[in-house]
Amino acid sequence: MTTGSALYIPPYKADDQDVVVELNNRFGPEAFTAQATRTGMPVLWVTRSKLVEVLTFLRNLPKPYVMLYDLHGVDERLRTKRQGLPGADFSVFYHLLSIERNSDVMIKVALSEGDLSLPTVTGIWPNANWYEREVWDMFGIDFAGHPHLSRIMMPPTWEGHPLRKDFPARATEFDPFSLNLAKQQLEEEAARFRPEDWGMKRSGANEDYMFLNLGPNHPSAHGAFRIILQLDGEEIVDCVPDIGYHHRGAEKMAERQSWHSFIPYTDRIDYLGGVMNNLPYVLSVEKLAGIKVPEKVDVIRIMMAEFFRITSHLLFLGTYIQDVGAMTPVFFTFTDRQRAYTVIEAITGFRLHPAWYRIGGVAHDLPRGWEKLVKDFVEWLPKRLDEYTKAALQNSILKGRTIGVAAYNTKEALEWGVTGAGLRSTGCDFDLRKARPYSGYENFEFEVPLAANGDAYDRCMVRVEEMRQSIKIIDQCLRNMPEGPYKADHPLTTPPPKERTLQHIETLITHFLQVSWGPVMPANESFQMIEATKGINSYYLTSDGGTMSYRTRIRTPSFAHLQQIPSVIRGSMVADLIAYLGSIDFVMADVDR
């Protein structure tokens, strides 16, 4: 096993090194091949025969890696810069997170094209279920022992595995789409739910169960989302969430866009998050490039990200209250969002999807008069939140519908990969802005809102308090905005600062290449997670030394949150499910990508 700086590139924490020592002591250094990356965590390759044993060891350490944060694959066949790594046609990575250590570790396993099979780890982490299904769906990698290995993003009738490098990436490479009656009937039959396929019975000892399709076009499903309910009267015996209706192939598209031109696509993952989506992507690209942005860029990025946290939470608040029966507040929250969008549009030029962050900075400097717009909003919103709390959130009907409903504890949340307000509502004090500050969050004073019961009501109240904390952060940005440039003076800043392009022919050529072909990033891997509007969102980028990403893995919080639904809602009423869905705060683009 390689050691020292070859293990991973700083920044890293002491606990990261501790786990490498523990693994070496248990399995011997020869069991691992370390990979040097810019992910900020140990990245270790193991053999397939050792995989389950290593993962089980990490899960059961005294300070365990309790969360399977992510699991996915890479088609390695066209990757040229793989020196020092095990030979592989495909690889699968397991990204583990320990709350107690505040530490991550990534375990990788190499596979040959003729033997694409791994043992399932659903017995170690229950949330591996959907991740393994997606890896099979996208790459065709089998997981032996999986309880139901089937399509999850693509339709049941789909042929091929889209994230393989030999699968077409453009619509023009496919035959024109047509839908005749026979094909329509085939698709409808393929979508039919058969309880036996999922281990469900159609009847019990004294009753017949009813199976109800909620969605994919139901107002309380919050998007194109289908959940099949097994009902005994109004009681939910079991359920099966069915996702993928909003899948657009964002990770595949990243392989055909330059590092710069993919930025607008990030806006459309959590399409309510705006520039919050840009942030983990540009931070990860900047790690690859070795760019350190000016202090002013960090403060601007934080200010605008917190504005979008507020707009997202306001929409959540209005629709959540509407889901449990109050029709009026949603109109007020949307009006309040408009006040925020007035500020956002004045600064970025756009409202919902500004695509405003850039590699090495932001698109342009703050406009004249921005201070007054921000100041007016900061002074105005807290009083509105007080009104919502008093008029709606203290309402006895709303509290009766949500207190004690769809509750789970911290242990269950971590097992299912829950992050964000859903995790903090259980009392777990884990907010990346405090635990692992990025973009200068360590320079701001704010509290991390917590609750204790982990129910639908607590999840709502945590988000309301998060809006108050966002106002505190924005106010500090307003009062302490640094002077200086809005872009880094670095060769890979894209687009480059305009003043540098008009001096001589060399800078003009550099500018032309970067805005046409795109910047060339060094071959390596990088990773960045942030505390986004709906939980932890991250980008894991692989560069092969080109103008486009070799592999872009987008880990979203909502995917994990929807997988948890059956474990939480069994034994509850259908009405409780509606309150639960509203309290999760998800959009299907964030789930399906």
UniProtKB/Swiss-Prot annotation:
The keyword Cell inner membrane applies. GO terms for cellular component: NADH dehydrogenase complex; plasma membrane. It is found in: Cell inner membrane. Pfam families: Complex1_30kDa (PF00329), Complex1_49kDa (PF00346). Residues 208-593 are annotated as: NADH dehydrogenase I subunit D. Signal peptide: none annotated. Keywords: Cell inner membrane, Cell membrane, Membrane, Multifunctional enzyme, NAD, Quinone, Translocase, Transport, Ubiquinone. SUPFAM superfamilies: HydB/Nqo4-like, Nqo5-like. It is a peripheral membrane protein. It is an enzyme of class 7 (translocase). GO terms for molecular function: NAD binding; NADH dehydrogenase (ubiquinone) activity; NADH:ubiquinone reductase (non-electrogenic) activity; quinone binding. Residues 1-184 are annotated as: NADH dehydrogenase I subunit C. Its EC number is 7.1.1.-. InterPro entries: NADH_DH_suC, NADH_DH_suCD, NADH_Q_OxRdtase_suD, NADH_quin_OxRdtase_su_C/D-like, NADH_UbQ_OxRdtase_30kDa_su, NADH_UbQ_OxRdtase_49kDa_CS, NDH1_su_D/H, NiFe-Hase_large. It catalyses: a quinone + NADH + 5 H(+)(in) = a quinol + NAD(+) + 4 H(+)(out). NDH-1 is composed of 13 different subunits. Subunits NuoB, CD, E, F, and G constitute the peripheral sector of the complex. NDH-1 shuttles electrons from NADH, via FMN and iron-sulfur (Fe-S) centers, to quinones in the respiratory chain. The immediate electron acceptor for the enzyme in this species is believed to be ubiquinone. Couples the redox reaction to proton translocation (for every two electrons transferred, four hydrogen ions are translocated across the cytoplasmic membrane), and thus conserves the redox energy in a proton gradient. In the N-terminal section; belongs to the complex I 30 kDa subunit family. This is NADH-quinone oxidoreductase subunit C/D. The gene is nuoC.
